[in-house]
Amino acid sequence: MLLICISVLAAISAHPLSSGEMRAAVSNLVREIDSTHLTTKPSLKIIEGLEDNTVSTGESVTLRCDVLSTPTGVIYWEKDGQRIQGDKELNVFEKVLNAMGPTVESGIITSSYQIPCANLHHIGSYKCVATNGHDTVESSAKISVEGQTVKCKSTRRSAPVITMSTESRFELQDNAATLICRADRRANWNWMFEDKKIDFDSGRYELLPSGDLLIRKIQWSDMGSYFCIAHNKYGESRGETFLYPTKKHIA
């Protein structure tokens, strides 16, 4: 299976594909890996969705979705059918790292979309969409805004806001596990395990460009709370997740 993964990725690199062809190739690779290595059937369920809401101009609104997913998925947002936050990119890198044996790749992902100062142009139908390469689920709500248009403070010079993160993650010991943490803008990233800053020089931890944390060969001692910190010169935002390493069953 590892050779298949490498061959597919090499072919993609050697022969640039259109975005549609690329998505199809990655999707096929995901299904191929998961069909062989997942310990349970793929599943995807929204456990906290959206509700219609009416707010006054100038109010802050936060929309949130929580999703239980096997394998790990991603969440993106749409307004009136147009994507406004996030993407459909799945974590193929972790799958390739774990392609030599069984994987659990299960947990809860949470995502939020923030309207810091509601105005009339924010009226519309909002949708959170979750996908894991096998299924797609969504939750939608209508946001109504009442009142006269107000002048809102610019958010350009603001601290980053965490927009998607892993709330909990289950994975077999000795496998790699990725803890998701994404922000609404470019940010500097730090990660902590319990009360200690993670040492990226140790070789087991890798900070991915997206802000995610990759942990190689997780052990029982890695169980606990992890905190991601996205920061810039204007401030910071934090997310928290819990990692559950599980024992491999020896036949």
Curated annotation (Swiss-Prot):
Give the keywords, sorted: Disulfide bond, Immunoglobulin domain, Repeat, Secreted, Signal
Residues forming the Ig-like C2-type domain are: 42-144, 160-244
GO BP annotation list: axon guidance; dendrite self-avoidance; homophilic cell adhesion via plasma membrane adhesion molecules
Lineage: superkingdom? Eukaryota
A GO cellular component term found in this entry reads:
plasma membrane
- SUPFAM superfamilies found in the cross-reference section: Immunoglobulin
Q: Where is the signal peptide?
A: 1-19
User: Which one Pfam family would you cite for this protein?
Assistant: Ig_3
- GO molecular function per UniProt: cell-cell adhesion mediator activity
- Name the organs or tissues of expression: Expressed in PVT, AIM and ASI neurons, in vulva and weakly in body wall muscles.
Summarize what gene deletion causes.
At the L1 larval stage, display defects in the positioning of the ventral nerve cord (VNC) axons characterized by axons of PVQ and PVP neurons, but not of RMEV, HSN and AVK neurons, drifting into the opposite VNC side (axon flip-over). These defects are not enhanced in a zig-4 (gk34) mutant background or in zig-4 (gk34) dig-1 (ky188), zig-4 (gk34) sax-7 (nj48) or zig-4 (gk34) egl-15 (n484) mutant background. In a zig-1, zig-2, zig-4 or zig-5 or zig-8 mutant background, cell body positioning of ASI and ASH head neurons is normal.
Q: Indicate whether Zinc-finger appears among the record's keywords.
A: no
Q: Report whether Signal shows up as a keyword of the record.
A: yes
The UniProt entry lists the main location of this chain as: secreted
What Gene3D superfamilies does UniProt report for this protein, alphabetically? Immunoglobulins (2.60.40.10)
What are the disulfide bonds? C65-C128, C181-C228
Subcellular location field = Secreted
Q: What is this protein's function?
A: Required for maintaining axon position of PVQ and PVP neurons postembryonically in the ventral nerve cord (VNC) by preventing axons drifting into the opposite side of the VNC that could occur during body growth and movement.
Its protein name is: Zwei Ig domain protein zig-3
Q: Which organism is it from?
A: Caenorhabditis elegans
Q: What would be the name of the gene that encodes this protein?
A: zig-3
